[in-house]
Amino acid sequence: MNIYDQLQAVEDRYEELGELLSDPDVVSDTKRFMELSKEEASNRDTVIAYREYKQVLQNIVDAEEMIKESGGDADLEEMAKQELKDAKAEKEEYEEKLKILLLPKDPNDDKNIILEIRGAAGGDEAALFAGDLLTMYQKYAEAQGWRFEVMEASMNGVGGFKEVVAMVSGQSVYSKLKYESGAHRVQRVPVTESQGRVHTSTATVLVMLEVEEVEYDIDPKDLRVDIYHASGAGGQNVNKVATAVRIVHLPTNIKVEMQEERTQQKNREKAMKIIRARVADHFAQIAQDEQDAERKSTIGTGDRSERIRTYNFPQNRVTDHRIGLTLQKLDTILSGKLDEVVDALVLYDQTQKLEELNK
C-alpha cells in the first residue's frame, strides 16, 4: 500500500467513525463511544492535512490549465506560473508532513504519567533545583489543561526536595513529557554562596507510565505492607490512628512510603499506584535491555543518568544536549513555557524515525 492508499484509508475510516459516533446505539454505549471518539481524534490531524493536500494538487492542475489557456496574455501566464510554483512547493511540504503523520504512533502517548524528581549531586542546591523543576512542570501542566497532583514529597531543611512524586493526567501527557527522563544540570550562584561563585548541581527526572491494576497485576504475596503512625516536623507522631503506609515489593526491594493523606485507605491506594508504576517500569527496562530494542526512543541513549539538559542562570540559557538545542530563555522555560523545547524534541524524534523508515 503506497502513501496515497494509506491516506485514503485513513480518511475513509475517519468518515466511517463520524457516522458511527452519530449512531444512537454507539452514543448509549459509553465505553465504545469513548474508544471511537479517541480514534477519531487521533486521525483528525492526518485527515485535515490530507484534504488540504488534495486541494493543493487541484491547485496545480488549475494553474497548469490556466497556463495552457492564457492565450498569449503575458500577465495571466506569469500569474499562473507563480501560482504553479507556489503550489508545487506546498505539495512538497505537505508530503513531508503527511509522512510524519503516518508514522506508527506510540500506543502509550495518551497515557497519564507518574513523575519523579530527585535532588542528586549538589546537596541543598540540587534539592532547591528539584523544586524549580517541579514548579516548571506544574505550570506547564496547568497551561496544557492537565491535572497535576503531588503524591509524595520528601523535603530538606532549606525548602528543597530530596524527592517528589506527582501524578500528571490529561490528554497526550506521555507524548509530551516522555523525553524528560534523565539528569537536569543547573549552573547558578547558590543563595548560600557569599563569594558569588557559580556552582553546578544536578536533579534527576524519571517519567513512568501510570499503570492500572488491570494492566499490571502484582501478586499480593510479593508485597509487604507496614502500617505506622504518620510523623510531622521534628519526627513527632501527628495521628493517634496509624494511617501511614509503607509497601515493599519483595522481589525487587522497591519501596514506597505514603503519609500525605489522612486515612490509611487513601495512603494505601496512592502507594499502590506508585509501586505498580515503579515495578512495571523496572521490568520494562530489563526487557528492553535484553532485547536491545530500546524503549529509550531515538533521542539520547535512554540511560536515566544521562545528562539531557543544562540550565545556565548567569547566561539565561537552556541547552538540550540530545538535539543540540540552545535557547536564551531560561526564565521563560522555568516559568512553564516548555512548548518550544517539547516541540523540538517531538520533531527530532519524528525525523529520526522517518529516516529509519526510508533506509
Curated annotation (Swiss-Prot):
Main location: cytoplasm
Single GO molecular function: translation release factor activity, codon specific
Localization per Swiss-Prot or TrEMBL: Cytoplasm
Modified residue annotations for N5-methylglutamine: Q236
Pfam hit, one: RF-1
SMART domains assigned to the protein according to its UniProt record, in alphabetical order: PCRF
Record's comment on post-translational modification: Methylated by PrmC. Methylation increases the termination efficiency of RF1.
Recorded superkingdom: Bacteria
Keyword ATP-binding: no
PROSITE patterns with a match to the protein in the record: RF_PROK_I (PS00745)
GO CC, one annotated term: cytoplasm
InterPro entries the record matches: PCRF (IPR005139), Pep_chain_release_fac_I (IPR000352), Pep_chain_release_fac_I_sf (IPR045853), Prokaryotic/Mito_RF (IPR050057), RF-1 (IPR004373)
Keywords: Cytoplasm, Methylation, Protein biosynthesis
Disulfide bonds listed in the record: none
Family: Belongs to the prokaryotic/mitochondrial release factor family.
Described function: Peptide chain release factor 1 directs the termination of translation in response to the peptide chain termination codons UAG and UAA.
Name listed for the protein in its UniProt record: Peptide chain release factor 1
Name of encoding gene: prfA
